[in-house]
Amino acid sequence: MMIRSHRHWVFSSRIIIFLSLLVHSLASSSPHFCRDDQRDALLEFRGEFPINASWHIMNQWRGPWNKSTDCCLWNGVTCNDKSGQVISLDIPNTFLNNYLKTNSSLFKLQYLRHLDLTNCNLYGEIPSSLGNLSHLTLVNLYFNKFVGEIPASIGNLNQLRHLILANNVLTGEIPSSLGNLSRLVNLELFSNRLVGKIPDSIGDLKQLRNLSLASNNLIGEIPSSLGNLSNLVHLVLTHNQLVGEVPASIGNLIELRVMSFENNSLSGNIPISFANLTKLSIFVLSSNNFTSTFPFDMSIFHNLEYFDVSYNSFSGPFPKSLLLIPSLESIYLQENQFTGPIEFANTSSSTKLQDLILGRNRLHGPIPESISRLLNLEELDISHNNFTGAIPPTISKLVNLLHLDLSKNNLEGEVPACLWRLNTMVLSHNSFSSFENTSQEEALIEELDLNSNSFQGPIPYMICKLSSLGFLDLSNNLFSGSIPSCIRNFSGSIKELNLGDNNFSGTLPDIFSKATELVSLDVSHNQLEGKFPKSLINCKALELVNVESNKIKDIFPSWLESLPSLHVLNLRSNKFYGPLYHRHASIGFQSLRIIDISHNNFSGTLPPYYFSNWKDMTTLTEEMDQYMTEFWRYADSYYHEMEMVNKGVDMSFERIRRDFRAIDFSGNKINGNIPESLGYLKELRVLNLSGNAFTSVIPRFLANLTKLETLDISRNKLSGQIPQDLAALSFLSYMNFSHNLLQGPVPRGTQFQRQKCSSFLDNPGLYGLEDICRDTGALNPTSQLPEDLSEAEENMFNWVAAAIAYGPGVLCGLVIGHFYTSHNHEWFTEKFGRKQHKALTSVKCSL
């Protein structure tokens, strides 16, 4: 919505400029008398740039630029009808593709008033010579590639009314000389890389109506001198690094229609002087550090259309007076500390209000039946509060409602049938238990999130009618029965499918042949049997597969190697069997980052080159986001932490970094040597090969894994010495060599000395453990432990379920589990953040 408002004021300023140019053009009527010096200057100017198609198109429109025609008739050129002097050059979108030279012939046009070079692909610095064109009233260099500082000489243009330098790559400080432009009406410097403070001299521009300095790197406080701009209509300072309190003088700007300070570090209270800004239609203070309550009755802003104070620390009761503003269309109050119940009985905004976003506050009580008064409501978000009771039946009167998010409350009862007509329904983390019966034949939901409720029985048949479904999360419920094959009805559109943590039985239907958009599939923690669906080979967009903790009985799906984007594969705790390696499978998992196939019945050996093509574990690719991320039309992005921000899904643990790499082959029957190619995986953080039958010595190439943090090779048949080279792995915080046939000295080194004595148990020939085992009193920990204690040790690294943040609700799971039940849970907490100690064997994430 903020983007929409931003475009609104940009569009308004463009209209002002367009009308100004139109009036000027109409005033310059025939006859035209082009002066030779003006014509020659224009031709020389054109000669400074390569000829290209855009010039050709321009010439066809109003005639060619050449000596045989009147230059006053040339495209983009306007002359004074008396003197023949060129007074306007308006050639946007001509893609000049060159520098604007300091000695350009453009600067011979001394009587130029209007200069519009919008989107001409100009680069280099803005020539200081521009300041010599003293008649200029408009300079528009919008959307080019100009670099360097804004020339101070522009401050000499005392006739200038419009200065538009936005969307370039300008650096340096805003020159204080701009304060000399006493006739300036429009100043647009947004979307550059300007630094420093906003100069006080900007407050001298008494005629200014539009000031946009958004999306730069400006620092310091908002100067109080801006309060002198009594004609200002638009004030946009978003996306900078401004600090301190907003000066009370801003309340002097009584003509202000648009005020946006979004995404800075402003703090303190809202000045009480803001009560003077009664003409505001757009009021945005979001993503700052404002505190306290609103110091005035909000209904005084009787022209307000868009109100956004989200992502601050405002407190106090829900500001009901906002609902008395008849023109209000959007209210964004999420991520604050508002308290109390909400009520809509006394509202004047029932016919206008479209967006009501109240998520992540401290609101409580029932959802009022008076919600039905908001007849035009399209989006309602009251997630992450303490609302109780049932969804009121009056919600059926909101016939325009498209997006509903009630997640993370204490709501209960049945889901009204009318909600199937929505586009987005997010009801996760409540206590809903059933669905109202409906005869509805059609449903248009694209995003449906019912996770973490108390639903039971078979999947609602209405889900089978969602032919456009893109996101479905039914996880953490009590659904039972078979997974219906009718999910093929939306297989062509589904991207995220999470049915994990239910009681589904039967087979996983092999119905994914048309699921070419599928990104994430999670059916973990059910009772599914049978084969692994081979139709997944058609899902070329697939990034995550999690079938953990089922009863699937099949051979290893090596054909998944062909999926170009598969990052996470979790087959843990099933009945998979047979060898991992097939001689016809030669591609390798090139994109795999996390694999967990532990606690199955895999057997056989791995050839030395088995990991040779696992490229994503060898080198990191440059990625924009730090965390695995997915974007949805209705939901915000989900990196930084794996919780829903707008209309998505919550998770129990925090995000996982994109650079995390892990392999867990533990609890199988794999034998032979540890493959040599494992040493190529230099980005690997976790390696668990425990509980197999690997033989020979511990390979020295493991010392090549310089980012390794966890190494568990316990409960194998490894012999020989522990390589001294492993002591050089400075990130290695946990290792386990117990229950092997190792001998010789334990390497000296800080990482080894910090391990627990149990990490070396049952290796009869090991010695040098005096310092490590001093606290236990077992200086020679080589005897076989009782079976139950041994089992506890070997399960220490069942590290399943570290999550993967794929986007507006993707499903994930993988890499956590028994870290939290063992002495090493501190390591996991440090890496992934603290939340409730709620999932001991797995973690649910919705990407």
From Swiss-Prot:
The keyword Glycosyltransferase does not apply. Residues 1-27 form the signal peptide. One of its GO terms (biological process) is meristem maintenance. It is found in: Cell membrane. The chain crosses the membrane at residues 799-819. LRR repeats lie at residues 109-133, 135-157, 158-181, 183-205, 206-229, 231-253, 254-277, 279-301, 302-325, 326-350, 351-374, 375-398, 400-422, 424-442, 443-466, 467-491, 492-514, 516-539, 541-562, 563-587, 589-613, 657-681, 682-704, 705-729, 731-754. Keywords: Cell membrane, Glycoprotein, Leucine-rich repeat, Membrane, Repeat, Signal, Transmembrane, Transmembrane helix. It is a single-pass type I membrane protein. Pfam families: LRR_1, LRR_14, LRR_8, LRRNT_2. Residues 28-798 are extracellular. Glycans are attached at residues 52, 66, 103, 132, 180, 210, 228, 263, 276, 289, 346, 386, 437, 489, 503, 601, 688, 704, 736. GO terms for cellular component: plasma membrane. Residues 820-847 are cytoplasmic. Belongs to the RLP family. Involved in the perception of CLV3 and CLV3-like peptides, that act as extracellular signals regulating meristems maintenance. This is Receptor-like protein 12. It comes from Arabidopsis thaliana. The gene is RLP12.
